[in-house]
């Protein structure tokens, strides 16, 4: 749900679970020998050429993140145009945490043991990217497919009712997209760790991975904010797919293009060393052994770790409403649009969604800048103080969003033509500032919890895999809770997104207090930890 949800999103996918499974020492020696030459093993290659090749070998991370940014910014609003009620949009996102919890560990287990000639990671990256391309095309053409499956034949410019066949096609594509994203993310990050060992070190590899994710996020949100796709490519519009839908198609077409190009570059430059069959660790009990080992390890966790898990869970309870409803809030509460209203109201809503995508771009920039100063802040203030401050900031920003939404909707009547003149400029500016500022605590969300968990488990003799594995449980469970309850709560109050944001703000305040009281004093945040939290 991401960065997360960017990305939301590595936080919920637990890319580091591959550390729970091991290979023999001979494999590690081969990997170091490979890295001591170059990415492809050429010992004569200059250091500059090695780092450039390593940089482009990770290009697939940018392509995947581009598509993920589109998913975060556009798909909740788009699903409502197909007839999925605002109260049940959250249920379409329930696959994300499930996929992150189940798919990534299993893919990590088998990618550690893959003996194909093309390497351990690239087969999974290839298959995952192909499924992503198919999934986004299913989503983009869901309205057209639904029309052929029995939805209304009335033109989309006049029809305002539900299109259930299209909605079902959309959900299938959405869920496949979530599973495919998790298939690619773990092996791609693990491959960077493999290729950067030796000359460069894991921090360099993970920093490159993070940079590509940032590039993908910025380009993805720019694409989502663009409302000209239907003008540049008029053939995207059909009787079932009007301007907003055509813009979604255009954005996803570019996603397919970028994913194919970035995947091709990665497949060519990431010259992995094949794993010999005799080097495969066969002592485990298959992919399910990952879960068995994880839950067994819970019994041996240090007491401080349970407090870290509790604070992490409450933190994610506060974040998921924003991750899910950000652009919808801009389209509804600020722009006064309706996804299933008249053509004019739908256009206003679409304009608000695109403005929200621009706000998420500002959020990504703030996140990237903040990530560089987090290690220094943690060393100066301790990690728990930084974590606590970030939660109080989320509380303040959620409160502002609730207040701005209520002021914007005060006296508003959907039947009034004044609602079509656009949002209040001051309120729109405040909303964009909130979107930008929320990138600051989001940088903490994607780094500090992982660093604290790693330090606590390391003090007790645990490893990174243990830390990330158990922390993933504390991330998945609250996401499931919010996904199951946020929409129905909004529907019960009939207040749009305001109740979810209010609840999120309350959890953020509680978590700010708990972080100060419960968390141990730690100060270290490595570069790898900064990008481990995901998107």
Swiss-Prot record:
Widely expressed. Highest expression in sink leaves and lowest in germinating seeds. Residues 75-87, 144-163, 225-249, 324-354, 406-429, 487-498 are extracellular. The chain crosses the membrane at residues 54-74, 88-108, 123-143, 164-184, 204-224, 250-270, 303-323, 355-375, 385-405, 430-450, 466-486, 499-519. This is Sucrose transport protein SUT5. It comes from the Eukaryota. One of its GO terms (cellular component) is membrane. Belongs to the glycoside-pentoside-hexuronide (GPH) cation symporter transporter (TC 2.A.2.4) family. PANTHER family: SUCROSE TRANSPORT PROTEIN SUT5, SUGAR TRANSPORTER. Responsible for the transport of sucrose into the cell, with the concomitant uptake of protons (symport system). Can also transport other glucosides such as maltose, arbutin, salicin, helicin, alpha-phenylglucoside and beta-phenylglucoside. Keywords: Cell membrane, Membrane, Sugar transport, Symport, Transmembrane, Transmembrane helix, Transport. Gene3D superfamilies: MFS general substrate transporter like domains. Residues 1-53, 109-122, 185-203, 271-302, 376-384, 451-465, 520-535 are cytoplasmic. Optimum pH is 5. It is found in: Cell membrane. It is a multi-pass membrane protein. Homodimer. GO terms for molecular function: arbutin transmembrane transporter activity; maltose:proton symporter activity; salicin transmembrane transporter activity; sucrose:proton symporter activity. GO terms for biological process: maltose transport; sucrose metabolic process; sucrose transport. CDD domains: MFS_SLC45_SUC (cd17313). SUPFAM superfamilies: MFS general substrate transporter. The keyword Transport applies. Pathway: Glycan biosynthesis; sucrose metabolism.
